Regions:
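N-terminal cap/lid segment of alpha/beta-hydrolase-fold proteins
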Residues: 22-54
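Conserved beta-strand positions that form and line the central face of beta-propeller blades
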Residues: 33, 61, 146
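Short alpha-helical segments and helix-capping/turn motifs at coil-helix boundaries
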Residues: 46, 77-80, 156-161
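Cap/lid segment of the alpha/beta-hydrolase catalytic domain
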Residues: 55-138
């Protein structure tokens, strides 16, 4: 009896674990290390609608809290700010900020915007967002050239910090 129980437990665990990792209906996940103007690469997870007959806006969240789950076959349980957004057909993008989790560079807590940059390679949160959106528009084929940024708490800080010298797509 205990062998049967063990076999059923193993089968059930493996079956439901594999089901939990299936792709999000209607989306394909890509991962990229996006180069910033100073050469630092930021880890980015991109969820693209499978329907390529339309062009979609980009909805970006930059976070110090991890954009896990990592791996192109591992999908977030929910895309966007809440479940209502999942049927709205955005290209959802999540990015680990500098020095956090899978991204390169040094993390600087609540870094202020730099009004005057000493060189074209000097960065702040606004320039990292700009470079990210520039890369996404150039490399994700079915985008419509528009982007939005959102966040609550620390990701909300990153959304606000992206506004000085913002990318024109925002």
């Amino acid at each position: 009896m205990s062998k049967l129980f063990l076999l059923v437990t193993i089968y059930t665990t493996l079956h439901f674990t594999s089901c939990a990792q299936q792709e999000k209906t209607g989306y394909m996940k890509k991962e990229a290390m996006i180069s910033m103007r100073d050469g630092v690469k930021l880890f980015t997870a991109i969820y693209i609608p499978l329907n390529t007959s339309e062009k979609y806006p980009i909805l970006l969240q930059r976070t110090p809290y991890s954009c896990a789950p990592y791996g192109e076959n591992n999908y977030k349980k929910r895309l966007g700010p809440n479940s209502f957004f999942e049927s709205e057909n955005y290209i959802y993008v999540y990015q680990d900020v500098r020095g956090r989790y899978m991204s390169e560079g040094n993390f600087e807590e609540m870094a202020p915007a730099k009004d005057i940059k000493k060189s074209s390679k000097e960065t702040d949160e606004s320039s990292d967002t700009y470079d990210t959106i520039e890369w996404l528009i150039a490399n994700i084929s079915n985008n419509n050239g528009r982007a939005g940024i959102y966040g609550i708490s620390y990701p909300g800080f990153y959304a606000t910090a992206s506004l000085p010298n913002a990318h024109p797509a925002i």
